[in-house]
Amino acid sequence: MLLVAGIQFKHIDHYKQYVKLYTQSISRCDLLGIWDCSMYSQAKEYYDFIEKMYPNLKKICAHGLEPFYYMNNSQYCFDKIFKNKKVLIITSHEKTTKLQISNIPHIFKSNKIFHETTEFYVYKPPQQNGGNHDDNPWTHHFEKMKEELKTIKVQTFDFDIALVSCGGFGMLISDYIFSDLKTSAMYIGGSLQLFFGIMGTRWKNSSKIIEHINNYWTYPLDEDKPQNPQLCESNCYW
């Protein structure tokens, strides 16, 4: 959980609190993305638990949150979601994402992910994965994130929706945004960087992603890399 998801447990109560909040986050979703195939089998026992506890929870295939897989569909309209919207981007690739915002019109050759009227604000969460961790438990960073996001919402950028990618904090902070800040949130996860044409090792052999790559794509800047990125699924996001 620490090297990949950035979640540090210092004692048993931290485990219990994390599981409690994670399950609560799922229970309050409007729509839950479920992975298929091998990804499903890895978490089958937990999926079975969710199905038993919340049988009426609406679900979709998690790939539905990744529009680059179905951009060529004649009914594609993902970009309409963001028309005239203020969008908060939560990502550890802060500096790279900010640079890529100006390239958004050129990143994808056919359809787009964001509407031309969309406004952005990029927030970098505490990055604890890839050897970047300190000695604080996950609860310390979670509370700090909540305070900072509330300040952004109230004082700086009254966002309409948050797109979230921040490891093991993602589901919990999405629920905080939705339930406490009363604002829409989509927990995209690691693939959020692809929305901005930021490539990572995980997708270098994916034909579905490679077909979109052009001169406006890039890899994360060195400033956005943790100390030992190879510790996180063999450098998957960098």
For each predicted feature, which ranges?
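Electropositive, gly/pro-rich neighborhoods at or near active sites that engage anionic ligands
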Residues: 1-117
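A short, acidic, amphipathic alpha-helical segment used as a generic capping/interface helix at domain edges
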Residues: 16-20, 141-155, 169-171
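Glycine-rich phosphate-binding "P-loop"
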Residues: 55-64, 121-149
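Short acidic/histidine-rich motifs immediately flanking catalytic phosphotransfer sites
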Residues: 157-160
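C-terminal functional extensions of proteins
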Residues: 169-238
